[in-house]
């Protein structure tokens, strides 16, 4: 299989011949040490694909990092998921609102009956660092509307349904 690869923004395309199917992540891992930023996404034949996407036929691949709009959105979404998990682990079942991006950051609000303490904020931040260090995969799962309503409701997010 032939892959026309652009390893980073602005780089020339390279022609690769690969014997067996490979994921975008496996391909990106070959180039990552030479790249200035972590690969977060790939554009395969004009369509953005996750790192788990399996390349199994001739194609054109552009590796994308956070300098691109779409990869930056993936980064922000991943950060939001890590934040939500950390809040849940530290504070329990609290509703969290993640608002618009503000000046390269996210504005969030944790809905609690009592004000959040400095210690709790530090604990959430510490838990986020632990989750990042654990390098856990974020796996996309697809649900029916009914399943999604049930799941979001169980996590105290009825507005998501």
Predicted regions and their residues:
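Ubiquitin-like/PB1-type beta-grasp interaction modules and other compact soluble beta-rich domains
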Residues: 1-80, 84-86, 91-105, 126-130
